[in-house]
Amino acid sequence: MNQIDLQGRVAVVTGGARGIGWAIAQRFLQSGAQVVLWDIDAQELKQASKTLAAVADPVAGAGVVHGQCVELTDDAAVARATHDTLATTGRIDILVNNAGITGGNGLTWELDTEVWRRVVDVNLIGPYLTCRHVVPAMLARGYGRIVNIASVAGKEGNPQASHYSASKAGLIALTKSLGKELATRGVLVNAVTPAAAKTAMFDQMTQAHIDYMLGKIPMGRFLEVEELAAMVAWLSSEECSFSTGAVFDITGGRATY
């Protein structure tokens, strides 16, 4: 594993109690950061914090993990979480907007309206709200790294997943706009567009859709969460210094543009 220096940094990872978020949190801890998990599931959050604490090696405040239960689609809840995190850690250097849902699969005209709205709320409105409250704290210090976990579905549009694809396309556009707005302020904003990784999100999909996604990947396998965590770690570091509003592909050759 290549060493990426996040020593002394404070990172917020949304949806950090499982899957991709957990792997990112683990990589951050191994790189010396303090990590704050924001997640809606209190039980999984408690377990993840405990497991990650065992991975951490606290030295001078590094490798510390905190957990906070947050409904990321609620503006007031995100405001409180931001306030509480700043009160606990003193600052937020890194924000990873990872929390997301698929909403199942179905033809666009047959998908439930409320499910469609919920997917957009979690996958797009949630990251907007976290940026809305965290960015001012980053600007006050003149430094920040924001990484949005989008999806190749946002670039290509997956059939029978219009709600998910549209929400991730919106997140890509949010990244581009915010990246331009903050380009001269010391806060860099980038997105990653991974192919599918085997996580609990597969439980929300049909087997036919899972097979479709695998068939689109030239490397013939799904993404490993550790591979994505490695890319996110670099994007969250000072070494990422001249990329903002950009979209980084990690799809095993599916998207080469």
Describe each region flagged by the PLM.
Residues P136, K180-T184:
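Alpha-helical segment proximal to the catalytic Tyr-Lys
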Residues G106-T108, D112-R117, F202, M213:
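Substrate-binding pocket helix/loop in short-chain dehydrogenase/reductase
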Residues S151:
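Residue(s) in the substrate-gating loop at a strand-loop-helix junction
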Residues M1-Q3, T102-N105, E156, A233, ...:
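Short C-terminal tail/terminal secondary-structure segment
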Residues A42-Q43, C69-A81, T113, E226:
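The beta1-alpha1 cofactor-binding region of Rossmann-like NAD(H)/NADP(H)-dependent oxidoreductases
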Residues C131, S167, T175:
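Active-site helix of classical SDR
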Residues A183, L188, S243-G245:
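Short, small/polar-rich loop/turn modules that mediate ligand/substrate recognition or access, typified
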